[in-house]
């Protein structure tokens, strides 16, 4: 018998492998989409918070927080807008000022937290001596100089609130490239007003 041979039929194991590969690609796409959504939300929120910083109103109609300061970190292309109240909900949208701390530049410790993989990812390159610019909503502008960088265990260490002079403390999760979120380690950058040096 001469002529073309019939194409072999796809065997069952090959179909199962194909289905498995398609499912794996769908799961991977969903994971990447979720990661992209987190970064997109963080970027969009900062744009809305910037508008609220200028106008004095809430960043969105249902918000129970307001921007209190603008923060410019070394090497950052854009300023970050800091929300009042260090809740997890606020941290999803931007850096947040701890409710128990003072406004930047006031006597006491101003503690601002942010996520290591979005707003505070640039803290990984921070060095002692770097300058951090802060502008409060009331127009006061303060330049801080990084005095110390530490990694602490949040289960054991507590941040002092009752310091006798203005101090800025930036806090984020550590290590910066951690695979699992919510570990106990925190990267803590302590800064003092440049005018006091």
Predicted feature residues:
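N-terminal Lys/Arg-rich, disordered targeting/topogenic segments
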Residues: 1-14
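Solvent-exposed, non-transmembrane regions of membrane-associated and secreted proteins
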Residues: 13-197
